């Protein structure tokens, strides 16, 4: 099997960053991204790789995408109770203010992979550019839980935050759910 190749259903996909680019406009940053993604391609082969290997590789691959970015006035990790366990959340406050609108951020990954760390930069940028508090919900993933538990956890976090909004210094009337 070639390095950087994997199977998706009946298709074999090969990522080879040494291939000639289709256009000479590919810059050095994008070339580095293609090289890095090729390094992790084997971990995403669902025919041979394990779920744990895939999640670990995804976390490593995403580190490059999450460095730098805006500084937050406050970053707090919370554990929100739900049905006998807790759901981790991260509150990002971009500026010191008495009350700010809230964006509830539910990361992408198809309910299979990802967390607040793999989507940290986009959360910080969202907070900084919108002026809103961003609450990243680190819902549990398949196969740890079955669908629709992740969505139920997100709803539970929103309800819980609604009951303690004064403690968090957020504006109760302006909320935006966002799944990215």
Residue spans for each PLM region:
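A generic beta-sheet turn/junction motif
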Residues: 82-84, 95, 106
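Conserved catalytic-core motifs of eukaryotic protein kinase domains, centered on the activation segment
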Residues: 115-117, 145-147
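Short strand-loop-helix active-site module centered on a catalytic nucleophile
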Residues: 89, 104, 126, 147-180
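Short amphipathic alpha-helix adjacent to the substrate-entry channel of hydrolases
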Residues: 117-136
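Short beta-to-alpha linker loops that shape the active-site pocket of alpha/beta-hydrolase fold enzymes
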Residues: 138-142
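Short beta-strand element of the alpha/beta-hydrolase
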Residues: 99-108
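Glycine- and small hydrophobic-enriched segments that form the cores of compact globular domains
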Residues: 109-110, 133
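A glycine/proline-hinged amphipathic helix-loop "lid/cap" segment
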Residues: 1-91
């Amino acid at each position: 099997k070639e390095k950087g190749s994997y199977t998706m259903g009946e298709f074999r996909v090969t990522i080879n960053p040494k291939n000639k680019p289709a256009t000479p406009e590919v810059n050095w940053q994008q070339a580095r991204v293609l090289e890095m993604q090729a390094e992790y391609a084997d971990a995403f082969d669902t025919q041979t790789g394990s779920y744990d290997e895939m999640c670990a590789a995804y976390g490593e691959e995403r580190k490059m995408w999450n460095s730098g970015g805006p500084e937050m006035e406050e970053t707090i990790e919370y554990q929100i109770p739900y049905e006998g366990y807790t759901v981790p959340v991260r509150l990002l406050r971009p500026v010191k203010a008495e009350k700010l609108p809230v964006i509830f951020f539910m990361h992408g990954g198809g309910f299979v992979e990802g967390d607040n760390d793999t989507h940290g930069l986009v959360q910080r940028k969202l907070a900084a550019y919108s002026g809103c508090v961003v609450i990243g919900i680190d819902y549990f993933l398949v196969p740890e839980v079955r669908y629709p538990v992740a969505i139920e956890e997100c709803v539970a976090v929103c309800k819980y935050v609604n009951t303690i909004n004064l403690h968090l210094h957020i504006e109760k009337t302006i909320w935006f759910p966002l799944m990215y």
